[in-house]
Amino acid sequence: MDMFPLTWVFLALYFSGHEVRSQQDPPCGGRLNSKDAGYITSPGYPQDYPSHQNCEWIVYAPEPNQKIVLNFNPHFEIEKHDCKYDFIEIRDGDSESADLLGKHCGNIAPPTIISSGSVLYIKFTSDYARQGAGFSLRYEIFKTGSEDCSKNFTSPNGTIESPGFPEKYPHNLDCTFTILAKPRMEIILQFLTFDLEHDPLQVGEGDCKYDWLDIWDGIPHVGPLIGKYCGTKTPSKLRSSTGILSLTFHTDMAVAKDGFSARYYLIHQEPPENFQCNVPLGMESGRIANEQISASSTFSDGRWTPQQSRLHGDDNGWTPNLDSNKEYLQVDLRFLTMLTAIATQGAISRETQKGYYVKSYKLEVSTNGEDWMVYRHGKNHKIFQANNDATEVVLNKLHMPLLTRFIRIRPQTWHLGIALRLELFGCRVTDAPCSNMLGMLSGLIADTQISASSTREYLWSPSAARLVSSRSGWFPRNPQAQPGEEWLQVDLGTPKTVKGVIIQGARGGDSITAVEARAFVRKFKVSYSLNGKDWEYIQDPRTQQTKLFEGNMHYDTPDIRRFDPVPAQYVRVYPERWSPAGIGMRLEVLGCDWTDSKPTVETLGPTVKSEETTTPYPMDEDATECGENCSFEDDKDLQLPSGFNCNFDFPEETCGWVYDHAKWLRSTWISSANPNDRTFPDDKNFLKLQSDGRREGQYGRLISPPVHLPRSPVCMEFQYQAMGGHGVALQVVREASQESKLLWVIREDQGSEWKHGRIILPSYDMEYQIVFEGVIGKGRSGEISIDDIRISTDVPLENCMEPISAFAGEDFKVDIPETHGGEGYEDEIDDEYEGDWSNSSSSTSGAGDPSSGKEKSWLYTLDPILITIIAMSSLGVLLGATCAGLLLYCTCSYSGLSSRSCTTLENYNFELYDGLKHKVKINHQKCCSEA
């Protein structure tokens, strides 16, 4: 049989069958324009889709800046089995190699899908086995509504509303509202109504899936996120001082509600002339809203919630579900805030009348709510001593202010059970004069204005070096570069008055090893320029050399470093030393407009009692002020306790110094008649210890806040007056937990004039206190006065020895009877020191002429042996001085050796405490002629 006709028959049957099948199964896939909305379905939908399908669609938008949105019909049925056989996948591009947005199967329809660009790739695949109804989706151009609802607000006040308010808002919105304020203006935002779609499965605050409102401290997605809000709970009042506050409003394609309405207004920030960083932050007043307070757990009866943890609250307090040192109370301050002190209080149960309180606790801080640092004292976690009963308030001061946003209190020990109420003290960074954040955090400084010497990878580029808002930070190419080789630079756009920087460590990503994941800079230098070419370094005013600033001790906790104002448009930071993980840095620049800078004294510390000391809670606002000179100017990297600098001007306050008000009298100046004395204004106060000689003696102590100077010594200045012959002694002692060390002493009448005292406070690994001890001997009439204690930033250390006679060597000591013990110095004074102490105000006839007729009598017993020792010591010093004078006279009388002898005397070194050596030079003219 001829095979040729048979072949033609088979071919005809094949093509005819193929044509019939093609007519029955319409082709799937294609290229679709989303200019007009349309639908894509699986073949045969809603009937079962056929087997062996491989359909591909490309959906594109007519404009390159447009996006595409896909919404699926809830009737969705594709074979399961982990999407191995039948599935639909969507990719963010025009091919199968684009990023996968989702791969779906089963009976649950996918959520709304939005492209990042103008093209989407869709693929549907089925195998030979089981089939289902398939899918149906609608594609269209994603309409954000930004043309209608995105606005900038610059007027002093205004209203922000969701689109269509008070009617229901539209679907698929992405709106941005930005409030812009001028420097020294605070933005206050108050919501009037709030109603967005609520997620019934919402777990916690900010867990919003459908419609929500984000509020940003700065430009959206650049500045830190303050909070995410949805449902019907109205956000509390917001106060921003960074100059930019933004809101982004997102809605999906489903349920729509009435939306929101809010009012904003701007108020001028005028810092006080004597800025004090000791303001209650709002736990007691309610300025900290309930939504900002949370806890690890709450007692099951619902009567001891975190929101009841406000100081002096009349309804119980916060109690966890279980009493454990793993529990914590947390406060979100919403913005970066200086924390300087914490006040705690227990609670009495309204149901059982039993008292519960926390006896000790730890402090944890964070800038983002995820990376936490336990507050340390030296190398160990600091354990704060808290309450001894359920009602008294205990104030604990931090020895250095902390810049943070989130605060956790972790109870360590307690009585009967954990119960806590508290208040936080501090201030905002921008409260200080000329301390505006110039735009790194808020995004006002663009990415193009941030540069660096080198960059490791894109994820750690200079644009990631924004304070707090970035989770990574800047990493240079070489993690272990030479000191000063790498730098990070900020272009401020226009010349500004720059007064400081805030420096923070950085976090690495997945491509950085675990050891390198957390890096920070320990020491750095700062340079500045007006043109980007001519650079100058910030100078240390004490040494007139390039200032080497202290950096961070933790990768998440920021530190402020201030310096004298300089004009600059460009600022560079040069890392000099860093953590083992290498160089990692985030940054903000502080300053103000070039014409706004004013020389103002400021401090960053509260005038509160020392930590671990039980004190009555200061109810009066004046009780936390300590005078116009109570603070040292622009802390300038001196990490000293708040309240150290003090002039004792306010009647009920001694800054951070502790003394017995019954012994140290507060006296008031009247303008001096002596032109050689320094001039004081009327009503200026000082402290005075006095005796009229009718009692056996007098002894008083004046104790500083805790000092921690592990890195470098500083110079302490004060004014003093000592009258009363050889029975008067004033000494300064460094007291630590294990030892006491004499630093300075005078033990004789100094006359009626006020004198300067200067002492070097040495570096010391442990925390210590400075103690002024005054002694007026038995049967002696005299007085000792002290005023204006402060840390000097303009006196070189080599000049910080005044008078020289007060530095008599290591072995010299004035014996003081052991009348004190323990660490709490209020107990020492109240319980163990004898004598009648009174707090009075008296006037003097002159700066150096007190009225002796009104002097108080004191009672103190000096041992006769002690008096003998003092007398013999005085005689020894007198004989030594006489011999030295004779030797000097003889030496200078011999002309051949006079020059060499004077030179030898000039080069004589006095060796002081802690290995510090200071040269005391004698004037050439006085060397021989006055002998």
Swiss-Prot record:
GO terms for biological process: angiogenesis; axon extension involved in axon guidance; axon guidance; cellular response to leukemia inhibitory factor; dorsal root ganglion morphogenesis; facial nerve structural organization; facioacoustic ganglion development; gonadotrophin-releasing hormone neuronal migration to the hypothalamus. Residues 642-802 form the MAM domain. It is a single-pass type I membrane protein. The keyword Disulfide bond applies. The chain crosses the membrane at residues 865-889. Residues 836-851 have a biased composition (Low complexity). Its main location: membrane. It comes from the Eukaryota. One of its GO terms (cellular component) is postsynaptic membrane. Residues 824-835 have a biased composition (Acidic residues). Residues 298-317, 601-621, 819-854 are annotated as: Disordered. Keywords: Calcium, Developmental protein, Differentiation, Disulfide bond, Glycoprotein, Heparin-binding, Membrane, Metal-binding, Neurogenesis, Receptor, Repeat, Signal, Transmembrane, Transmembrane helix. Disulfide bonds join C28-C55, C83-C105, C149-C175, C208-C230, C277-C427, C434-C592. Residues 298-310 have a biased composition (Polar residues). It holds the Pfam family MAM. Residues 890-931 are cytoplasmic. Glycans are attached at N152, N157, N629, N839. Ca(2+) binds at E197, D211, D252. Belongs to the neuropilin family. Heterodimer with NRP1. Binds PLXNB1. The tandem CUB domains mediate binding to semaphorin, while the tandem F5/8 domains are responsible for heparin and VEGF binding. High affinity receptor for semaphorins 3C, 3F, VEGF-165 and VEGF-145 isoforms of VEGF, and the PLGF-2 isoform of PGF. This is Neuropilin-2. The gene is Nrp2.
